[in-house]
From Swiss-Prot:
One term of GO molecular function: metal ion binding
Family according to the record: Belongs to the STEAP family.
Protein name: STEAP1 protein
Gene assigned in the entry: STEAP1
Binding locations of heme b: 174, 267
Length: 338
């Protein structure tokens, strides 16, 4: 969802223009650089892209790709979801069945799935901002912004919006599944069992202070994170993004996006609370899901902090405004000649 328009040469002229005009400027600049009649072709594509099935010829319908920018994000989401589901199933269901013959298969529809959803959501959100970090490192290494990114990185950056929308989708599902917990019959039976055990132990109060604080904090952070993700999703709608200036759009998608990733990571860390040092959490010598979930977001956040250091930040901004490191460019040219 993060915009790549901040690496162009005319950034200072575009800050107060609507995003639709920015896209037109990009098209005009491409036409000037390549001296090719791209505008008629783009107009033709624009005219055919929005026809319905009654207006568009059948042969043209078959030639058009179906959601081309969604292929990579959906594949990644499917892979992460499948691996997380199998991993959680092994720990939550298979392990107790093998070791103590306890049948917890009823956990699969809600509890297991609800451990998969936040893992996929925060991973996809980290994948939105990881290519920006890699792009900054590549530009620092090359000393210029005019050298093309690798094809895989360029494709990744183009699909960041789709990664972000999928992250929001899984976050909404996670919230809905969490709200359904009290409606489950198994939860009601467990609640009765807990009350009976409290009576048997002659406990008048089952209040656990630190556990109450843990839940209050991580639920609050989860709500705020979901609200920010909703804002990011709304601003990615073309009709909304076209009404924003470049600076407004960049602030929402970049700054608030990183804030949502930070809050989501803290949400997962507080959910874990003191489970990090609990040996019982390491079933079959495997770490719990939340440990794996926060790894990639933590790496992205640390890299973002490092790139915000003044010595690196100033150089990145200079490169993105057109400055070139002559020493690195000369070394690259010499190595290419050899």
């Amino acid at each position: 969802m993060e915009s790549r328009q901040d690496i162009t040469n005319q950034e200072e002229l575009w800050k107060m223009k609507p995003r639709k005009n920015l896209e037109d400027d990009y098209l005009n600049e491409d036409s000037r650089e390549n001296s090719m009649p791209k505008r008629p072709m783009l107009v033709h594509l624009h005219q055919t892209a929005h026809f319905d099935e009654f207006d568009c010829p059948p042969e043209l319908q078959h030639k058009q790709e179906l959601f081309p920018k969604w292929h990579l994000p959906i594949k990644i989401a499917a892979i992460v979801s499948s691996l997380t589901f199998l991993y959680t199933l092994l720990r939550e269901v298979i392990h107790p069945f093998v070791t103590s013959h306890q049948q917890y298969f009823y956990k699969i529809p809600i509890l297991v799935i609800n451990k998969v959803l936040p893992m996929v959501s925060i991973t996809l959100l980290a994948l939105v901002y990881l290519p920006g970090v890699i792009a900054a490192i590549v530009q620092l290494h090359n000393g210029t912004k005019y050298k093309k990114f690798p094809h895989w990185l360029d494709r990744w950056m183009v699909t960041r919006k789709q990664f972000g929308l999928l992250s929001f989708f899984f976050a909404v599902l996670h919230a809905v599944y969490s709200l359904s917990y009290p409606m489950r019959r198994s939860y009601r039976y467990k609640l009765l069992n807990w009350a009976y055990q409290q009576v048997q132990q002659n406990k008048e109060d089952a209040w656990i202070e630190h556990d109450v604080w843990r839940m209050e904090i991580y639920v609050s952070l989860g709500i705020v994170t979901l609200a920010i993700l909703a804002l990011l999703a709304v601003t990615s709608i073309p009709s909304v993004s076209d009404s924003l200036t470049w600076r407004e759009f960049h602030y929402i998608q970049s700054t608030l996006g990183i804030v949502s990733l930070l809050l989501g990571t803290i949400h997962a860390l507080i959910f874990a609370w003191n489970k990090w040092v609990d040996i019982k959490q390491f079933i079959w010598y495997t770490p719990p899901t939340f440990m794996i979930a926060v790894f990639l977001p933590t790496v992205v956040l640390i890299c973002k902090v490092i790139l915000l250091l003044p010595c690196l930040r100033r150089k990145i901004l200079k490169i993105r405004h057109g400055w070139e490191d002559v020493t690195k460019i000369n070394k690259t040219e010499m190595s290419s000649q050899l």
